[in-house]
Amino acid sequence: MTEVQRPPLTADERGQLIGWLDLQRSFVRMKCEGISEEDAHRKVLETSPLMTLAGVAAHLRWNEWSWFQKNLIGVPDTGQSPWTEGGHPDAEMFVDDVPIAQLLDEYDAECARSNEAIAGLPLDATEQGPYAAAGEAASLRYILCHMIEETARHVGHMDIIRELLDHKTGYTKMSLA
């Protein structure tokens, strides 16, 4: 079972931001616990056929990479991302042939890389990637707030998808440590 730990009740700004992001990240794995491979890839939202548990997990993995690796610390995209010039804007969600366990492991690994990338950076550090060159560099603080919102919003999607699949809702009991 995924360990879900509430963010610290009294922490500095950095601790709060990372704590809330890590909480939302843990919900991604939790929403997929016990799901069959078939259901992880099952399309239940007629108007959003890419919105499967597997598709959302893949989307969040690549958002982690894009915001923290590419944008913040300036790692160039040398073809490792699913996005190509002229390709589908949601290419990262085409994962029908990728096992959910692999997608979740890749997501966890990307989240760990994100945390490593930001470990020594002040919240006012700004992007070194493509947006910086265009004069639109966001701060680490902005990126953390955005990723909390992005991840939480998609966890809500996952909650709805899971409920439609097998009627499971909500969260498990959180550790108060």
Please place each PLM-identified region on the residue numbering.
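Short, contiguous alpha-helical
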Residues: 4-7, 14, 18-33, 37-90, ...
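Active-site rim elements
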Residues: 12-17, 99-101
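Acidic/histidine-rich alpha-helical segments that form the ligand environment
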Residues: 88-131, 139-150
